[in-house]
Amino acid sequence: MIVQRVVLNSRPGKNGNPVAENFRMEEVYLPDNINEGQVQVRTLYLSVDPYMRCRMNEDTGTDYITPWQLSQVVDGGGIGIIEESKHTNLTKGDFVTSFYWPWQTKVILDGNSLEKVDPQLVDGHLSYFLGAIGMPGLTSLIGIQEKGHITAGSNKTMVVSGAAGACGSVAGQIGHLLGCSRVVGICGTHEKCVLLTSELGFDAAINYKKDNVAEQLRESCPAGVDVYFDNVGGNISDTVISQMNENSHIILCGQISQYNKDVPYPPPLSPAIEAIQKERNITRERFLVLNYRDKFEPGILQLSQWFKEGKLKIKETVINGLENMGAAFQSMMTGGNIGKQIVCISEEISL
């Protein structure tokens, strides 16, 4: 059988901006037979995420993520349906997910590398397992629980940067659900600001491309900032940190403004901002969700429950077709998405 796949065509360079042409689609032969322990799956949805930017470099700069190789199939979060199985615990028709799903229309995988998912947890919206009821949702929930130090009724103010993205849009809502009295989002368009306040329950939203961020922050956070969910780093974060209270907390989720630069992760703060951090005893610890695997299952159940109760609103931007993986990645890296950026490869969920 002939199937399509996407491979890494070229590297943008550590300081370059990724473009759709860094990826290319090609055809490849899929064997007709599968071995014991293997399954053949049809890909339904694929995820593009900011962390993937470092996988485009020859060296990712981390010990837990490997680089993609030139002319080799690219991989990431994916979900699909089993068409044929020789694995004892997986049967035809099961829905499965993996963090290392090849960007390919159909693929033969080791059944042990896959996790079965229950469509009822997402009311049939399978792509949500790649977003709010998946790794981005867990990153937001566990990050806030472990590093935010929020308790019900503690009257805290939380600021979220990259607030209309996959993690940010969920993090702000979770802030309220766990007890923050005020949640303020920072994003890059008027449309995103309106969405945050009218649909996702944010108390205020700041457009960093148009507004004076420092001024707007002072206005929308009169009691200062107690918790900062940082998705972007750079100048925006410097502005937020300078308005943070004593003994406040930064949740380091990502630094997308720094991903196209050859700097360590997390990037060091400027001397002036670092002085503020130390003086006010602000915690800024690297957070890696993969270190909290024991909290994944209860976390997914909690996120699913909030979603079903209507307390967690889920937003996603969907592009169709494997041939658009590169365009979807480029768009996500430049803020073209609202909520989770998803690529739909096949919508047919029956066999």
Curated annotation (Swiss-Prot):
GO terms for molecular function: 15-oxoprostaglandin 13-oxidase [NAD(P)+] activity. The lineage of its organism: Eukaryota, Metazoa, Chordata, Craniata, Vertebrata. It comes from the Eukaryota. Functions as 15-oxo-prostaglandin 13-reductase and acts on 15-keto-PGE1, 15-keto-PGE2, 15-keto-PGE1-alpha and 15-keto-PGE2-alpha with highest activity towards 15-keto-PGE2. Overexpression represses transcriptional activity of PPARG and inhibits adipocyte differentiation. Keywords: Cytoplasm, Lipid metabolism, NADP, Oxidoreductase. Signal peptide: none annotated. Substrate binds at F99, Y100, L288, V289, L290. This is Prostaglandin reductase 2. Disulfide bonds: none annotated. Its main location: cytoplasm.
